[in-house]
Design a protein with these regions (language model features):
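Residue-level recognition of short, well-ordered coil/turn positions
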Residues: 22, 57, 121, 190-191
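Conserved amphipathic alpha-helical segments that form helical-bundle/coiled-coil interaction surfaces
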Residues: 97-164, 174-185, 192-207
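Short linear motifs at protein or domain termini
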Residues: 1-96, 214-233
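Solvent-exposed loop and edge beta-strand segments that line ligand/cofactor-binding
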Residues: 167-171
């Protein structure tokens, strides 16, 4: 088993701070603090920040340091609409190649997602991981590596918003149902409806996000408290 490098460890740690909201959009990422927490030197942290900047999660400001990138509604719209087309295109390609065994693998991932469909931080992170595996599986079957890389980049840029939206039962349930319907349509070999459902799934997530400014502005409550808010009139 390959040992995780210091740069990879720092990258994973910083990304999780951003995703879970411990580091807010516009907040400075202090190299000394990260290095101290991980008990490593600053160069690996600096290299990790360079990588995260390239992935669109961090921005560097001259003589000021690194900051969590801030997004506008236009940024969100651009990312989600592009993501919807990439995911639908991947599924369209995959429909020509997918096997019954691979459909069973997708079903298993959906079952695991359902088992983790709870508004607790550790469950949301598990749901996110399974969600990503589901779409990576489809893109791998599609056989287009460039498409896979583009989608992975977009996923990272909006992962923190995905984490926040999945803290609401309504959206968590809807996401799980979308994936179940997509697998059912794949099994039925209904290419047109499967691709449409894939687009609808991504665009539904965008609509939910933009209709909840508390999430978009990173002022949303902790996942464990969101159920109560979701039930308010």
């Amino acid at each position: 088993m390959r040992v995780e490098s210091l740069v990879e460890m720092a990258t994973r740690y910083i990304e999780e701070l951003i995703v879970t909201g411990e580091l807010k959009p516009g907040e400075q990422i202090k190299e000394d603090d990260i290095a101290g927490t991980l008990d490593i030197s600053r160069p690996p942290v600096r290299e990790a920040l360079n990588g995260l900047e390239g992935e669109g999660l961090v921005v560097r400001k001259p003589r000021r340091g690194a900051f969590v990138i801030e997004m506008t509604e236009k940024d969100i719209w651009e990312i989600y609409t592009l993501k919807a087309e990439l995911y639908a295109t991947a599924l369209n390609y995959a429909m020509d190649r997918i096997t019954n065994a691979q459909i069973l693998e997708l079903k298993d991932l959906v079952a695991q997602m359902k088992a983790n469909a709870e508004t607790k931080e550790e469950k949301i992170l598990a749901f996110q991981r399974l969600h990503r595996e589901f779409h990576i599986k489809i893109m791998t079957i599609a056989g287009n590596q460039r498409l896979l890389k583009m989608a992975a980049s977009l996923h990272k840029q909006i992962r923190r918003y995905s984490f926040q939206t999945l803290g609401y039962d309504a959206h968590l349930t809807a996401s799980n149902q979308f994936h179940q319907r997509i697998v059912d349509l794949i099994e039925q070999k209904d290419r047109e409806q499967a691709c449409k459902m894939m687009r609808d799934h991504v665009l539904d997530a965008m609509t939910f996000l933009l209709s909840h400014p508390d999430i978009f502005n990173d002022c949303a409550p902790e996942p464990a408290k969101k159920q109560k808010i979701n039930n308010e009139p």
